[in-house]
From Swiss-Prot:
InterPro entries linked to this entry: RNase_HII, RNase_HII/HIII, RNase_HII/HIII_dom, RNaseH-like_sf, RNaseH_sf
Entry's cofactor comment: Manganese or magnesium. Binds 1 divalent metal ion per monomer in the absence of substrate. May bind a second metal ion after substrate binding.
Chief localization: cytoplasm
Protein name per its UniProtKB record: Ribonuclease HII
Length: 198
């Protein structure tokens, strides 16, 4: 992997999202400005870390970062806008929530939302840029906790296990029980379960 070269600026925020693929729940984003004076060891793409390690790093990031913020787009916004535009909106909300305005924003992936400061998309940024890694950890821990909470209300769907992704088990339960109000009605499997597919 080519080493990432940082822009020549002080306050760099990293942004990542979790939850574009699931059939249920919000897409959750995070923005993080790390403190160079308080390094955090072991930052990596949240998907490559154990749950225990993610939880520990999440607390360390919140404690040590110069600023961090969460953003989200709810299922009804995803249905109205589509998942790409809803993700961009959630990223804008995360950046707007930072109590320190970044001079530059690095976004995981291949496209940037419109922001009031310069930004750059970084492919595989969650593995290459510590600020994006930190954002991916905050977003994943937050969304996983929301799915665990939803699992208590709707235990029959198994949200705590599959996090809302379209696993065979989830699709089977969707067909059996129908959709909850938290399901994304614009997504094909949910449409089919509701009998809305054309």
């Amino acid at each position: 992997m080519i080493e990432f070269v940082y822009p020549h600026t002080q306050l760099v925020a990293g942004v990542d999202e979790v939850g574009r693929g699931p059939l249920v729940g919000a897409v959750v984003t995070a923005a993080v400005i790390l403190d160079p004076a308080r390094p955090i060891a072991g930052l990596n793409d949240s998907k490559k870390l154990s749950e225990k390690r993610r939880l520990a790093l999440c607390e360390e990031i919140k404690e040590k970062a110069l600023s961090w913020s969460l953003g989200r787009a709810e299922p009804h916004e995803i249905d109205e806008l589509n998942i790409l535009h809803a993700t961009m909106l959630a990223m804008q909300r995360a950046v707007a929530g930072l109590h320190i305005a970044p001079e530059y924003v690095l976004i995981d992936g291949n496209r940037c939302p419109k922001l009031p400061m310069p930004s750059m998309a970084v492919v595989k940024g969650d593995s290459r840029v510590p600020e994006i890694s930190a954002a991916s950890i905050l977003a994943k821990v937050t969304r996983d906790a929301e799915m665990a909470a939803l699992d208590i209300v709707f235990p029959q769907y198994g949200f705590a296990q599959h996090k809302g992704y379209p696993t065979a088990f989830h699709l089977e339960k969707l067909a059996e029980y129908g959709a909850t109000e938290h399901h994304r009605r614009s997504f094909g499997p949910v449409k089919r379960a509701l009998g809305l597919a054309s």
